[in-house]
Swiss-Prot record:
It comes from Sus scrofa. Belongs to the CEND1 family. It is found in: Cell membrane; Endomembrane system. Residues 1-115 are cytoplasmic. This is Cell cycle exit and neuronal differentiation protein 1. Homodimer. Interacts with AHI1. The gene is CEND1. Found in the spinal cord, cerebellum and cerebrum, where it is localized in neurons. Involved in neuronal differentiation. Its main location: membrane. The chain crosses the membrane at residues 116-136. GO terms for biological process: adult walking behavior; cerebellar granular layer maturation; cerebellar Purkinje cell differentiation; negative regulation of cerebellar granule cell precursor proliferation; radial glia guided migration of cerebellar granule cell. Residues 137-140 are extracellular. It is a single-pass type IV membrane protein. Residues 1-10 have a biased composition (Polar residues).
């Protein structure tokens, strides 16, 4: 797809890299050591050490930020303190529905629909496959 540039994974790019890594023989005819070149490259490629930040104090509130656990309810200040009465708009209606459905009519009809949808999808795919095979067989 790329007509102009070559990707880094192409074998020609690797061949160029290996030829560049090889140094020409020195004037006296000896090939310089590859280990020296690798050591020099390693020194050049080493990133500067990142400054370390002093560790922040960890509090329990910060550690529990991403936890799924709910905090324990706080104990009332006095033993005879009654919980606040539930008023309109604070979710009292939803908490009192014993049947689990809206308005006490029973469970939601769409609650367990996922397995039915999967089974229906498999049945439709099988029917399409059978009809496709029959159609192609009649054409010949």
């Amino acid at each position: 797809m790329e007509s102009r540039g070559r990707s880094a994974n192409s074998p020609k790019a690797d061949a160029k890299a290996t030829t560049e890594a090889r140094a020409p023989p020195a004037v006296d005819g000896k090939v310089p050591s590859a280990k020296k070149q690798e050591a020099q490259k390693a020194e050049k490629q080493e990133p500067p050490a990142a400054p370390t930040l002093p560790p922040a104090k960890k509090t329990s509130a910060l550690l529990d930020n991403h936890s799924n656990l709910k905090p324990a309810p706080a104990a009332p200040s006095s033993p005879d303190a009654a919980p606040e009465p539930k008023g309109p708009g604070d979710g009292a209606e939803e908490a009192e529905a014993p049947s689990g459905g809206p308005g006490g009519r029973g469970p939601c009809p769409f609650e367990n629909l996922n397995p039915l949808l999967v089974a229906g999808g498999i049945a439709m795919a099988a029917a399409a496959l059978i009809l496709g095979v029959v159609f192609l067989a009649r054409k010949k």
